[in-house]
């Protein structure tokens, strides 16, 4: 996501070479990546892509990480066949590109995904996580869908409008101290407003010395100084989901 006028700097990060363990499926009008644990479960997590699309190996790695901890995961194509953003794209066209990929207009796709999880996977407990553009989607969904029992929003842009703070279920917000897209003043305002308006559990956490995309776009093997922060953020995600959808 971006502070509206310029693309998210996710392309600064590393593209993980990763084969993925799940499979691609067609669910009504959308495609999705689905990963299932070896043992049966009634718990699932929806994984929402960044602007680089549902097929990005980094996002599928995160989905499979959750699957390794016992969750069915699904990463739908929320762009519904439209091209994801490419680092080579002309940045001046980003605002126009984003108009047909609005993070707050995903209800049709989410309804299809929820139906699939409940009817085809027999899921009873559902959470959602999202990165960048997907972080905005996650925040939006946690305001609209009570069946989503927990959310983790990673570095999603913050919009200061009054209907953004009445969370329906517990939500963890993770940000990076050195994120040039999301000023820390906005993060502080989000936390202040949530303290006033939210009636459910939430946490806003800022990781020092980290940049936008660090949890899913940095390869800890070649960024050893960042490894403790990457691992801590992923651990926080798992703990949050375990606490609220188990």
From Swiss-Prot:
UniProt-annotated catalytic positions: 132, 179, 212
GO cellular-component term (any): cytosol
Tree of life domain: Eukaryota
Entry GO MF terms: hydrolase activity
Key words, A-Z: Cytoplasm, Hydrolase
Assigned EC number: 3.1.-.-
Subcellular location: Cytoplasm, Cytosol
Pfam families: DLH (PF01738)
PANTHER family: CARBOXYMETHYLENEBUTENOLIDASE HOMOLOG (PTHR46812:SF1)
UniProt family annotation: Belongs to the dienelactone hydrolase family.
Function as written in the Swiss-Prot or TrEMBL entry: Cysteine hydrolase.
Name of the protein described by the UniProt record: Carboxymethylenebutenolidase homolog
Organism of origin: Xenopus tropicalis
